[in-house]
Curated annotation (Swiss-Prot):
Record has Disulfide bond as a keyword: no
Function field: Binds the 23S rRNA.
Protein name per its UniProtKB record: Large ribosomal subunit protein bL31
Residues annotated to bind Zn(2+): 16, 18, 36, 39
Family under the similarity heading: Belongs to the bacterial ribosomal protein bL31 family. Type A subfamily.
Cited NCBIfam families: L31, PRK00019.1
Gene name as annotated: rpmE
Natural source organism: Petrotoga mobilis (strain DSM 10674 / SJ95)
Length: 71
């Protein structure tokens, strides 16, 4: 590995919009998140097996391939 060409990695605190703070190594000085594992519904168990389909794509797929899926 060549010396002196790689950016310096430093330990930073990443702040989420929910107020949670996480530490990680990065080449940037500060980093902000919109969603993290503390506030995302999937990691909190609120999403479960729900499928969020606001445009009917899942139902359209099921209707299109219903004969194939039944066999």
């Amino acid at each position: 590995m060549k010396q002196g060409i790689h950016p310096e990695m430093k330990l930073i605190t990443v702040k989420c919009a929910c107020g949670a703070e996480h530490t990680m190594y990065s080449t940037v000085d500060n980093f902000r998140l919109d969603v993290c594992s503390e506030c995302h519904p999937f990691y909190r168990g609120e999403l479960g097996s729900q499928i969020l389909d606001t445009e009917g794509r899942v139902q359209k797929f099921k209707n299109k391939y219903k004969d194939f899926l039944e066999n």
